[in-house]
């Protein structure tokens, strides 16, 4: 049997979930020789000390401990675990998951180079029922979880069915992840999974969901907090509101990156490759910066008459990190020191002076007056713009309502976006290995 590098990230208030996950690893893995990597991003419950006691059971347990006053965040720490993995095959498990019997044997049976293998989740009824998972309530408290009952349920419900949905837990060859640069640290609280899915598929990796490997998932423990579902918990509900704000900012960054929120259509053959067309916008008569922000995200470049808009937009981009920093308890001072660790939006790369616009060098140009454009065009037109361009066969000049656009070259540029680079971490800011 090949050895797997199981990668688990954890943070504050999760020790009981971690203990349960390790119980399931001990009970349900067929071998204890696999490498287990745990990234402790923050710790307020003695998780590090408890994990040290597990080295006798799991001789290849490797603990990565963040000692900074800020969290790396899961986009970054997943990348770091995969970088540190000793084996060709990596398998990511969230700390609030529980694995079925012979999980390692099953994923090894199905994974191969060029395959992104997703296990099937079993979740409590906190989210809508869906065809991509089992909904079954084994409880919300990890200290009261009946591992034997879950293991029996999983044995009874395993099947050889395969579908194509994408989510954690997942297993793949480490090289496939490294080849596209891993998670983009531009996304700090959500959307990082959708982004990496698009890039993996563009790099000819196929997503396969096996219904033979099952994992219970308490859901949203890391992103929203262990008590996010408790309507009577005021602190948890306040945190949930901040997470929702952070989600909105992440969606804006995703739209800037890919033109709209999308995954590529899921067909019987798997996810289709996404397409992306470079669209430059000449936005005239900008008086309302909030309105401008709601429109500018749909274009890869924006040209404006007033250069001051560039600085104003940079301030808006910088403000977007406030919600994530609040959730991660990162002060403004700490963010100034450590923000270099993450990809960030730079307004001057996207927003430029109208005097610099050479339309002959642009693939596609759209022109409109911001004051005369209604917000309804965002949902009726702009979120579909990439698809509209894709379905437009001829080049030339066209009009749609207040928009005038010219297609000089219809070239799919998605291939240039599949590989990303994240900033290097300074040596003095690296985690320690134990």
Question: Which residues does each predicted region cover?
Answer:
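Short, acidic, metal-binding catalytic loop of nucleotide-sugar glycosyltransferases
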Residues: 23-33, 294-300
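A conserved acidic beta->alpha catalytic loop
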Residues: 39-49, 306-311
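Glycine-rich, basic loop-to-helix element that forms the pyrophosphate-binding segment
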Residues: 67-85
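Short beta-strand-to-loop acidic/aromatic patch adjacent to the donor-nucleotide binding site
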Residues: 87-100, 363-370
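Conserved donor NDP-sugar-binding/catalytic core segment of glycosyltransferases
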Residues: 98, 102-140
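A recurrent flexible, glycine/aromatic-enriched loop bordering the glycosyltransferase active site
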Residues: 150-172
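A short, conserved alpha-helix in the catalytic core of glycosyltransferases
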Residues: 164-181, 187-214
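Active-site donor/metal-binding and catalytic loop motifs
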Residues: 209-238
